[in-house]
A protein has these predicted regions:
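A short, conserved beta-strand element in the Rossmann-like catalytic core
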Residues: 38-41, 107
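Active-site nucleotide-sugar/metal-binding loop of Leloir-type enzymes
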Residues: 19-30
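C-terminal catalytic/acceptor-binding lobe
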Residues: 100-102, 106-174
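Short beta-strand-to-loop element that shapes/binds the nucleotide-sugar donor at the catalytic cleft/hinge
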Residues: 61-79
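Short beta-strand-to-loop acidic/aromatic patch adjacent to the donor-nucleotide binding site
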Residues: 28-39
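Conserved donor-nucleotide/metal-binding helix-loop-beta segment in metal-dependent transferases, i.e.
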Residues: 43-62
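Acidic donor-binding segment of Leloir-type glycosyltransferases
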Residues: 1-10
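Conserved nucleotide-sugar donor-binding
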Residues: 28, 79-92
Length: 174
């Protein structure tokens, strides 16, 4: 019962802008930050995701999964977080609009952890092969880009984090 989602190849813009535009046009109830290089290893991963609504019927939660990297399992990091439509509606965005590409997963993880709504599914494996040799990969992985996005992350945490936490907590109590 899934509807195909149209996509557009167009002007050069931040990936975050593109992801938000896609989410805003989609009737989906969950959104995942992941590219076309992902390999979904675990069978029925989609149903496992949907089953998390039983834990939080208000829909305010974030899902993280195993990626095949030991660091991620130890620290329960989620470079490919999954959020819900309710989460997006509460915050007003899919991913924080001020980010260009990197660090928005950290910010989202921080929010979910802060409100105690981070579900880490270590038995669900989604492996991603990082493509690092093409022109786009080289352009977005420079030291300057990393410093820019780290600065945006720190400023966003400083200026907006408590506000975003309050919006999510308010949505939890509805």
């Amino acid at each position: 019962n899934y509807k195909c989602i149209d996509y557009e190849v167009g002007i050069d813009r931040s990936t975050v802008m593109s992801w938000n535009l896609i989410a805003e046009s989609s009737p989906s109830i969950m959104y995942m930050l992941v590219g076309d290089d992902a390999e979904f290893i675990t069978k029925n991963w989609d149903q496992i995701f949907l089953d998390q609504y039983k834990k939080y019927p208000d829909g305010i939660f974030m899902i993280g999964t195993a990626t095949g990297k030991q660091h991620g399992l130890i620290h329960k990091t989620s470079p490919h977080p999954v959020i819900t439509k309710e989460w997006r509606n509460a915050l007003g965005y899919f991913w924080p609009v001020q980010f260009h590409h990197w660090c928005l997963d950290n910010y989202t993880n921080d929010l979910a952890t802060r409100i105690n709504r981070y579900i880490f599914l270590e038995d669900v494996m989604i492996k991603v092969k990082k493509i690092t040799e093409d022109n786009t990969a080289k352009r977005i992985r420079t030291d300057a880009v990393n410093k820019r996005d780290q600065w945006v992350y720190e400023k966003t945490k400083q200026c907006y984090f408590e506000y975003d936490v309050a919006k999510l907590i308010k949505a939890c109590s509805k």
